Amino acid sequence: MRTLRIGIVGLGGIAQKAWLPVLTNTAGWTLQGAWSPSRDKALRICESWRIPYVDSLANLASSCDAVFVHSSTASHYAVVSELLNAGVHVCVDKPLAENLRDAERLVALAAQKKLTLMVGFNRRFAPLYRELKTRLGTAASLRMDKHRTDSVGPHDLRFTLLDDYLHVVDTALWLAGGEARLASGTLLTSESGEMCYAEHHFSADKLQITTSMHRRAGSQRESVQAVTDGGLYDVTDMREWREERGQGILIKPIPSWQTTLEQRGFVGCARHFIDCVQNQTVPETAGEQAILAQRVVEALWRDAISE
């Protein structure tokens, strides 16, 4: 099997913190280079990571089999379209595109070109969340909270819903097994239209699902709580596992070998995409799964602005 040639588009904060440490550890692939429209900044970053800088998106596409896209959401449609039309497989940060219509077009284009298009929902690959998912066969309720210390603004409601709350909705619905029906919800905004608090209630058969986010909670905390027939589960910040059963409380320590990026699912996400490209299999977050949560979140936003 030929070694997969990987490229990177976009070298912002998330790319530097979460993706470059994974992708520069070339286990089974080669990192051909990176491109960013901010040339001077990109050159400095590429030099520090010892990555070749490529002077255009077209040249990057011509030298790669697959590309990870970490550019701004506003650029996703144009960048991903160009890569797919050049015959390149793509893994892109969420959301797939700035609006649902463009996201659907990209899904259709990837299908037409018979290429892999995956959205990098890293939480689906967090080991503790994946383990929790196997324990939810008899779950009665599932609650996911993702709060911020003090992050009201500067962006508007729609931006924050798609940039951050989307993680909560996607992870909760994935843990619950897929689609769910919205029962009720609340969206509170500041006087200038910035998101302050969101809480929504969904149902999937007998399972009740709650998603919640406060933008000024005084704590940067993420947790998932599940009530099942015979056990209570609580996963905090993707690294603390607490399980309560009749015989007592089990708290699992973090494996000493597991890095933070592995705990948060970035390593698993990147490897899953690369494995799918190499083996010509369908990623877990491709097709409708790539845009399921975006459909829900955009509907929440439309409902909020129509009130």
Curated annotation (Swiss-Prot):
Query: Which top class of enzyme applies to this chain?
Result: oxidoreductase
Q: Name one GO molecular function term.
A: nucleotide binding
The answer to whether keyword Transmembrane applies is no
Q: Which UniProt keywords apply?
A: Oxidoreductase
- Which SUPFAM superfamilies does this entry report, sorted A to Z? Glyceraldehyde-3-phosphate dehydrogenase-like, C-terminal domain, NAD(P)-binding Rossmann-fold domains
The similarity annotation says: Belongs to the Gfo/Idh/MocA family.
- For this entry, the protein name equals Putative oxidoreductase YceM
Q: Which organism is it from?
A: Salmonella typhimurium (strain LT2 / SGSC1412 / ATCC 700720)
Gene from which this protein is expressed: yceM
